[in-house]
């Protein structure tokens, strides 16, 4: 029986290493939820920026091993660790308190809260922090906000609204930051594939 079960696990791709990694992640998530989400956000944000750079270089037919901007993934790691993970953790918990699932139309109300309050505030914070991490002055921040905020927010609303509907209504609260980070990883790659 054991060899058959072992073979079935191997065929399903659920070997002992992924199983242990998942078990460890869940344990850390239970013991240190904010730190675990912060670390996960930092790693996935950096990976997303790195992947975006590789895609851009490949599209331009450049050598992918040369001239990678290591400061980009570092900035995204800092932003993910100190902002995305912790803020996402507390926002989703507060959302559960403010709009319990028993409230009529809770899913729609949560989505509106996320899209109309959290998304614009979080996008503004992103522009501010990235501006600071890039060593830019307040004039550069104001220029980025003026030229880039509304287009970025409109694109955010178009792309992330269905994602957040699923996240808020169907993903357990402890996994919402991870789900959003995994989608963001592909979002960065998609933007890079468009040459943005």
Curated annotation (Swiss-Prot):
Residues 1-30, 98-115 are cytoplasmic. GO terms for cellular component: cytoplasm; peroxisomal membrane. The chain crosses the membrane at residues 31-51, 77-97, 116-136, 175-196. Residues 52-76, 137-174 are peroxisomal. It holds the Pfam family Mpv17_PMP22. Keywords: Membrane, Peroxisome, Transmembrane, Transmembrane helix. It is a multi-pass membrane protein. It comes from the Eukaryota. The keyword Transmembrane helix applies. It is found in: Peroxisome membrane. PANTHER family: PEROXISOMAL MEMBRANE PROTEIN 2, PEROXISOMAL MEMBRANE PROTEIN 2, PXMP2 MPV17. Interacts with PEX19 and SIVA1. Belongs to the peroxisomal membrane protein PXMP2/4 family. Seems to be involved in pore-forming activity and may contribute to the unspecific permeability of the peroxisomal membrane. This is Peroxisomal membrane protein 2. It comes from Bos taurus. The gene is PXMP2.
């Amino acid at each position: 029986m054991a060899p058959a079960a072992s073979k079935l696990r191997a065929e399903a791709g659920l070997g002992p290493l992924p199983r242990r990694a998942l078990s460890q992640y869940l344990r850390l998530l239970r013991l240190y939820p904010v730190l675990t989400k912060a670390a996960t956000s930092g790693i996935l944000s950096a990976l997303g920026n790195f992947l975006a750079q590789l895609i851009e270089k490949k599209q331009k037919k450049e050598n992918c091993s040369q001239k990678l901007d290591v400061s980009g993934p570092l900035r995204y790691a800092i932003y993910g660790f100190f902002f995305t993970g912790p803020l996402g953790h507390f926002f989703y918990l507060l959302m559960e308190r403010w709009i319990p699932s028993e409230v009529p139309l809770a899913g729609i109300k949560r989505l509106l809260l996320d899209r109309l309050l959290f998304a614009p505030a979080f996008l503004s914070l992103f522009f501010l922090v990235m501006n600071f991490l890039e060593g830019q002055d307040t004039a550069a921040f104001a220029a980025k906000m003026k030229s880039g905020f509304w287009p970025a927010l409109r694109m955010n609303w178009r792309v992330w609204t269905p994602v957040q509907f699923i996240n808020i209504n169907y993903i357990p609260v402890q996994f919402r930051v991870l789900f959003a980070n995994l989608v963001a990883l592909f979002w960065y790659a998609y933007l890079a594939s468009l040459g943005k």
